[in-house]
UniProtKB/Swiss-Prot annotation:
Signal peptide: none annotated. It is found in: Cell inner membrane. Keywords: ATP-binding, Cell inner membrane, Cell membrane, Membrane, Nucleotide-binding, Repeat, Sugar transport, Translocase, Transport. It is a peripheral membrane protein. It comes from the Bacteria. This is Putative ribose/galactose/methyl galactoside import ATP-binding protein 2.
């Protein structure tokens, strides 16, 4: 169903032109543009890392632009911080809700701006609740302002966030993946509120990857790719295939690889019926020795959650794990390591790498027992020799094994974590975003290392948000959406378009 309201086609409410933003070593945005009309829902789409969040954080005052101009109602404006954005009537509803569970609904809406009583000392609770109720009446929402937020469902908490934004007289709302944690009935209620806001002239920027939802709610869609603007089109005049083509249209790596046939190799890891709330829903897969199994999907699809669950970092509600054909119980990372499973987190500086320790101790961190002599003393020479051996094998660039890990490049830090699990004799390895934050040359080295590990019989799961990387490295690809495996692709048959189709649908398919 298409929106039944024709948005204002005159002067934009908000116009961003020529927006540029650079972070150390990365051009996040390059000559981007975006405009929002009063009384429209404008979808913003792009792959992970396309620059959507950075652009919206500039509009919300979280980041400062390095180039370009922002106009409201045709006049140039400066948005120095989130308060300035609020003063201009720009509100943002983050995917991670920013509420205090112990406070009431009304207290959350007006936190820091509570109406005061006669002498300006005490909060006027009656007026506080009355003002909140007035906003809910505008939203046609039956919600008691006195209810503690912690007692509400996620959907109701999201409504409180919207009410908070409206309390600033917001003329523009940015919604980042607003339906990620909602069921169908809750999505319908959210869409009703969005349509009401649109009818009252509020402009809404809607960030989502869910094509079926965008068909129902969006008037226009803008696509970004690699930090650049691609196109803006009316939603009624485009197709899912066209949008996906715009999202993944960058030139692929020209290097071609013929993955080895691992179909006859021993199954190293088998997962059946893995579930944890809404994050992981009946996930099952097999992983063979010598195989690189790619996990693709959009942000929030559940890939990292699966890896953490198998590694014992997060509890599960149900599921069976078999290692080399044997059923095992994994409740903690120590259990996983005991069965030869290693996990390289996407956030290596906080999980997996002791950033303040030296190279030697980081490599030996998970294998300290083997270096204990007579139950009391550490074999410092043995640790040093082992660390030096892996520094040579993995070509870790460091002046010595005594160098603090924090002084090494991202690529070399990643190699240290790999060395740690190899020293621990792990033969099943989960790599979560293995090349995030490292340069092109270091990426190539990591790719070669993964290939070498697979050739040596290691069983590898590689989670990556970069589709060219998934296509280049994987022998087989599983795609996830909303906690489910929605499809499996053989490397020879996989394309970016097929992956994106599976990453934006909710039912399982096998494409070939």
């Amino acid at each position: 169903m298409q929106p039944d309201l024709n948005p204002n086609t005159t002067q934009p409410l908000i116009a961003l032109t020529g927006i540029g933003k650079r972070f150390p070593g990365v051009q996040a945005l390059d000559d981007c543009r975006f405009d929002l009309r009063a009384g429209e829902v404008h979808a913003l789409m792009g792959e992970n890392g396309a620059g959507k969040s950075t652009l919206m954080k500039i509009l919300a005052g979280v980041y400062q632009r390095d180039a370009g101009e922002i106009r409201m109602d045709g006049r140039p404006v400066e948005i120095a911080d989130p308060r300035a954005a609020q003063a201009l009537g720009i509100g943002i509803i983050h995917q991670e809700l920013n509420l205090m569970n112990h406070l009431s609904v009304a207290q959350n809406i007006f936190i820091g701006r509570e109406p005061r009583g006669r002498f300006g000392v005490f909060v006027d609770e009656e007026k506080l609740n009355r003002d909140a109720a007035a906003i809910f009446q505008r939203m046609r929402l039956d919600l008691d302002p006195r209810t503690p937020v912690g007692r509400l469902t996620v959907a109701k908490q999201q409504m409180v966030e919207i009410a908070k934004a409206l309390s600033f007289d917001s003329r523009a709302l940015i919604m980042d993946e607003p339906t990620a944690a909602l069921n169908n009935a809750e999505i319908a209620e959210l869409f009703r509120i969005i349509r009401d806001l649109r009818a009252h002239g509020v402009g809404i920027i809607y960030i989502s990857h869910k094509m079926d939802e965008l068909r129902q709610i969006a008037d226009r869609v803008t696509v970004m790719r690699d930090g650049k603007y691609v196109a803006t089109v009316p939603m009624a005049d485009t197709s899912m295939e066209s949008i996906i083509s715009m999202m993944v249209g960058r030139q692929l790596d020209t290097e071609t690889r013929t993955p080895p046939d691992t179909s006859g190799n021993e199954i190293a890891l088998e997962v059946r019926g893995l579930s944890r709330g809404r994050a992981i829903r009946d996930v099952g897969f097999t992983l063979r020795r010598g195989e690189i199994l790619g996990f693709a999907g959009l942000m929030g699809a559940g890939r990292t959650e699966v890896a953490r669950a198998v590694f014992g970092a997060d509890p599960v509600d149900a599921g069976e794990i078999r290692v080399h054909g044997r059923a095992v119980t994994i409740r903690t990372p120590a259990d996983a390591v005991k069965y030869g499973i290693g996990y390289l987190s996407e956030d290596r500086k906080h999980f997996g790498l002791a950033i303040g320790m030296d190279v030697q101790n980081n490599i030996a961190l998970s294998s300290m027992r083997r270096f204990v002599r007579r139950g009391l003393f550490l074999d410092a020479r043995g640790m040093r020799d082992a660390a030096r051996s892996y520094v040579r094998q993995l070509a870790i660039r460091t002046p010595s094994v005594a160098q603090p890990a924090r002084l090494l490049s991202g690529g070399n830090q990643q190699k240290i974590v790999i060395a740690k699990w190899l020293l621990r004799d792990c033969d099943i390895l989960f790599f979560d975003e293995p090349t995030r934050g490292i340069d092109v040359g270091a990426k190539s080295e990591i790719y070669k290392l993964l290939d070498a590990l697979a050739a040596d019989g290691k069983a590898i799961v590689m989670i990556s948000s970069e589709l060219p990387e998934v296509l280049r490295m994987s022998h087989r690809i599983l795609v996830m959406c909303e906690g489910r495996v929605t499809g499996e692709l053989r490397a020879a048959d996989a394309t970016q378009e097929k992956i994106m189709q599976l990453a934006t649908q909710r039912e399982s398919t096998v494409l070939s």
